């Protein structure tokens, strides 16, 4: 079926269906059966994926029952690492040494989805924090795979679901790194307006209901991309009611949801029960129709340099994403995976929770210090909301219409840089007065200098009402973090 035919079919179904989004509670809402066939969502490259036969697969396997000489694997005699020992936080002076079997395992090719022990630990996270059932529950099967960070996971999703010219629904401002993998693939964006609780349901419903009249040249979307906790760049926290309304709209218009949630454990204002913050439920936790693809990462609360995250979804979509992972990198680094697995296993749930609590307390302190600096140096010059989660303040510079021009022409020459609002906008032709301030990395002494410099430069820039021209062509877009 052609994309235009699908759009017309959905429009016809909506005309024949009266769905009251607000008339029923989420639990009373009549959801359809979970999606059985995902073929209409898949990219052309995944419409006929490369399927290996059992004989071909066995070529790459070696076990006590199979002697395999078909795979291009090096001899264990070549492996350079003979000993490796870790000293982890929250374990005192206790050190963790890798066994010879561990070292042989991680210096050789392994399963594309990741090391089984690490995947099982991550599955326990999803069960503990998102209420997922046993992964093998009949009719509710789900799975996850390890990725070298969510950025690579996004790249896999783009290849799995999008063709050139397809459309993605995004928030009015969103993660700039997402554009690095979508724009080169020719993906179009339709931005939905936001308020203090995230994407506005009525705006989303109106956008999709009037698609053919408002976006006649764009294909009807197949997916929505959202960052629900500590939204990047705004710091917004979607509440449960907002998630439920958006999920019902996704069901109404037959859309999949990409839930990119790097800041899930960085919720800062939630109620504390038994020494732990009660974290908001995710889209994954309310997924009745198998529409959610969830991205998690260890980058924001553990280590960004280890480049490790995981993708969770139903078993049918799991195979599609695993195919793209295998096609691109085979699998994530074995050494990184086992280091993380040993850390998590030796920590256990209690010490993992202690680390999360430690991170939250550090961020609360740094957030408070950032507010003090904003009030001290920039009162009356900026507007901002206090972020409820995540790492960022979304700051509006008063008296200017384009933060990019201000940073390019003035601020950078004073050796101070903030995230550019335009880097988070799906429409790079519209000027924005916003900057993103990463408070997690801010030390108070440096903040004094940076915010004082920002204040002085703003005053001078507005007073002179002119743009200082420079000969060099400078591009300041930062789509990395």
Curated annotation (Swiss-Prot):
**Assigned keywords, A-Z:** Aminotransferase, Cytoplasm, Pyridoxal phosphate, Transferase
Which molecular function GO terms apply here?
Answer: aromatic-amino-acid transaminase activity; pyridoxal phosphate binding; transaminase activity
Q: Which residues form a coiled coil?
A: none
The principal localisation class reads cytoplasm
SUPFAM superfamilies per record: PLP-dependent transferases
Q: Which top EC class is named for this enzyme in its record?
A: transferase
Instruction: Give a yes or no for keyword Cytoplasm in this entry.
Output: yes
Catalysed reaction(s) here are: an aromatic L-alpha-amino acid + 2-oxoglutarate = an aromatic oxo-acid + L-glutamate
Modification N6-(pyridoxal phosphate)lysine occurs at: 300
What job does this protein perform?
Answer: Has aromatic amino acid transaminase activity.
To which protein family does this belong? Belongs to the class-I pyridoxal-phosphate-dependent aminotransferase family.
**Name by which UniProt lists this protein:** Aromatic amino acid aminotransferase DDB_G0272014
- Name its species: Dictyostelium discoideum
